[in-house]
Amino acid sequence: MKKLMIAGVAGLCAAVTFGLESANVVGYQTKTIPAGFSLSTPTFQDIGAEGLDLQNFKLADTAAGDSTEMIQFLDADGQCTEMWVWLNANAGMEPGWYDFNTWAPIVKTVVPAVGYLMNSVSPVDMVVSGQVKSGETTIALPAGFSVRGNNTPADIDLQSIKLADTAAGDSTDMIQFLDADGQCTEMWVWLNANAGMEPGWYDFNTWAPIDYTVKAGEAFLFNTVSPVEMIIPSAL
């Protein structure tokens, strides 16, 4: 099986604060990003929007800000398609995300539940803010690999993340969680009536039902042979 090699895992939620603005639940969340690579996804979206502006992924003042903190987005083959670096006064720039090659400022919206690779030479805090998405998130998964995650600011049970009825459900839809060396530590497969099972996530090797908590903002590697939709529950 093809593996995506990374060197770290996503930092867990350090703090989350909520408020109420009109009908929107708004707030912010602080995550500690470890040294090395990690998989993550934003837990808020911009108020009145359907995603979060990448410039609202704020790194703390302790960030090196000299192009050694970067975000990468991947295609269905696990290859990097976009790479942005965090620059600040240490690079003579206003704090923000810039193009890796040109250092030009960038505009990018990250839609709910889309994950990314974060790379940092040292641990650093990241703050995301905005509104909590109301209602569940339904997101398309292409054939091949994709990075998806828990886009709510709360921990959720993996079994609450569902695949659409069109899923093959015969062990060809799978989720992997990775360790600090980029090796798979947990692998779960989606089974349904096509495998003679109740729809849900099961151990890859034994097909035993599993109990696993996906942390707020934690992302994972998903692999499928055919496009399918994933449904992530609402935090509200």
Regions found by a protein language model. Name each.
Residues 1-21:
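Sec-dependent, cleavable N-terminal signal peptides
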Residues 4-5, 60, 90, 164, ...:
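Residue-level detector of intrinsically disordered/flexible regions characterized by low predicted structural confidence
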Residues 17-67, 75-79, 106-172, 212-236:
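A short, polar beta-strand/turn micro-motif
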Residues 70, 101, 174:
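Short acidic-hydrophobic catalytic motif
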Residues 72, 78-92, 122-130, 179-196, ...:
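Extended intrinsically disordered, low-complexity coil regions enriched in Ser, Thr, Gly, Ala
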Residues 80-112, 186-216:
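A cross-kingdom feature marking solvent-exposed beta-strand/loop segments within repeated
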Residues 151-202:
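Intrinsically disordered, low-complexity segments enriched in Gly and acidic/Ser/Thr residues
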